A protein has these predicted regions:
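Metallocofactor- and cofactor-centric catalytic cores in central/energy metabolism, strongly enriched
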Residues: 1-217, 224-303
Length: 303
């Protein structure tokens, strides 16, 4: 259900044009200024939508159709040792099955971008990756922000000392696969395999962008912890066991066992099984607690 006030610039009729083709029985609109009791009207619309959705049946879908977003936040000294390499191993596995993974938070790539450039499938993708990086650097400079204004205080407290160290951890999340696509902010996924997506490092903005691109879930590694979630399952993978123990309501999977003598391969097997369960409907913590938010990357004038 799409709800509008009725006097804003983004009118429902204009919004509909950008949606393209959609099922009129499954997408409904309500303009609150045009109805009497918006609560009752909204509940009636939701009851109608539920009646149709309740007839849906689950069907088997191969892993080749799964699309995941790769993100990190509140990184620490273990990020590049445990959780990020785990995501990289999973990403390579998923892509080998014909699936798709998406890496974003471009400013976090500064200092390790040549690793991604060297893995582009062709010259066109190489040039697009160069533009992806340089475009964000120019954005920083245009606002007087130092390109190297990273790592954050939390990163430093967790043991990360330089931007390059943080960037090397960031790029590990996408494994060793070749880059098959580069997308500007707001674009929907078109290619399978590893895609690079333009978005800032801000957790909620980046996660929203990944979900909007068509990712079914966001895999989020963290060493410091965060409870947030966007409108798709936002799975938190801890880099250390202490965080997983202290924040069971935040963390969904503990990668800290990798430094406690569990082989990476065994951890990845358990991780794959868990992701399949979540893709099949099992809730992660942000869903259980109702943490579902979005944030839009804005620049320029706000009226």
């Amino acid at each position: 259900m799409v709800v509008g006030l009725g006097c804003e610039n983004n009118q429902p009729d204009v919004f509909r044009e950008f949606l393209g083709e959609f099922d009129e029985d499954r997408v409904k609109f309500m303009v609150t200024q045009k109805v009497g009791d918006e609560y009752e009207e909204g509940m009636e619309i939701l009851r109608d939508l539920y009646a149709k959705a309740s007839k849906d049946e689950r069907t088997d879908v191969p892993l080749s159709e799964l699309r995941v977003g790769l993100k990190c936040g509140g990184s620490d000294g273990f990020s590049g040792i445990t959780a990020n390499p785990l995501l990289g191993m999973f990403s390579d596995f998923l892509i080998a099955q014909g699936g798709t993974s998406v890496l974003t938070e471009v400013p976090e790539m500064f200092g390790a971008e040549t690793i991604l450039m060297n893995r582009c499938k062709n010259e066109e993708l190489f040039e697009q990756t160069v533009h992806l990086i340089n475009d964000f650097k120019e954005y920083f400079l245009s606002h007087g922000e130092p390109v190297g204004e990273n790592p954050s205080p939390g990163n430093k407290a967790g043991g990360i000392s330089t931007l390059e160290e943080k960037a090397l951890g960031c790029t590990q999340k996408c494994g060793k696969s070749y880059v098959s696509g580069v997308m500007p902010y707001g674009e929907r996924l078109q290619k399978k395999g590893l895609n690079l997506l333009s978005a800032p490092g801000n957790d909620l903005v980046a996660a929203t962008t990944l979900a909007a691109s068509g990712c079914h879930m966001v895999l989020f590694t963290t060493g410091r912890g965060t409870p947030f979630g966007t409108f798709v399952p936002t799975m938190k993978i801890s880099t250390n066991s202490t965080l997983a123990k202290n924040k069971p309501g935040w963390i969904d999977f503990n990668a800290g066992v990798i430094v406690e003598n569990e082989p990476m391969e065994k951890t990845c097997e358990r991780f794959i099984d868990y992701i399949i369960k979540v893709a099949s409907g099992e809730f992660v913590n942000n869903e259980k607690k109702g943490y579902r938010e979005i944030a839009i990357f804005k620049t320029g004038v706000t009226l």
